[in-house]
């Protein structure tokens, strides 16, 4: 089997590192570096386990894209730190001690020569979805703690799998179409697309998406298993001769405007204008700028984490 292209959900991983690694981990100058250490260590573990020859850390260049807010104004509204004047992009509420650590992580990635991928006006989910969908050569492994990305699983044209970090990296679960279909009771031949439709119907309070009132995950899965797709569900709801329960038909039809809007909000983009910070996503076996990498590692007090990353790289074929 070919070595995979690994796509890391940057924000998902450094948020989990921030909350999962003790804040007592500090740099020599006293600044917290728990997220930095956790992120680098997690990357080393993923490299050791998956043995990629290509890798990109995918970034939110816009964590709350306007096209999604225009469709559903409540989208991530509860995460806005303070409304910005004059149409400026909203700022996400982030722990004060995490923000500077994100800059540290990006400095280290840049010094090491590890590709960072982003697209103006799009979230990391869209970047991941675009890169996974357009890959035609290598199998793809998406690493994230965001269930929304289960919609990108595929078998063709290349295998796309999601390493879901819901319970942490040590207990991560690898999902492909078969696993998504089995776990959620969805049609196996379109498990990824069906998962997006399940999420749309169920809703997601963490993203400010209400879902269809009275339709939970179990009901949504049953509808998709029975009818095959969201379009067919809505066609059945609109058909007076359908066997669908009258109460359920009423709920779906009452929510038809929401369903139409949420369809574009929930599905990840697969055509985002993604660019890389490096000429290639080929994974460097040694730091591109070893002096700067060493200086940053010393300044941030993460020499041991960088050493573990290099040890993981040393196991990869040249």
Curated annotation (Swiss-Prot):
GO BP of this protein: DNA replication, Okazaki fragment processing
Pfam assignment, any one: 5_3_exonuc_N
GO molecular function, one term: 5'-flap endonuclease activity
InterPro entries (UniProt xref): 5-3_exonucl_a-hlix_arch_N (IPR020046), 5-3_exonuclease (IPR002421), 5-3_exonuclease_C_sf (IPR036279), DNA_polI_H3TH (IPR020045), FEN (IPR038969), HhH2 (IPR008918), PIN-like_dom_sf (IPR029060)
EC number of the protein: 3.1.11.-
Record keywords: DNA-binding, Exonuclease, Hydrolase, Nuclease
Gene3D superfamilies hit by this protein: 5' to 3' exonuclease, C-terminal subdomain, 5'-nuclease
Any single Gene Ontology cellular-component annotation: peptidoglycan-based cell wall
Function: 5'-3' exonuclease acting preferentially on double-stranded DNA.
PANTHER family named among the record's database cross-references: 5'-3' EXONUCLEASE FAMILY PROTEIN, FLAP ENDONUCLEASE XNI
Protein name per its UniProtKB record: 5'-3' exonuclease
Organism the protein comes from: Mycobacterium tuberculosis (strain ATCC 25618 / H37Rv)
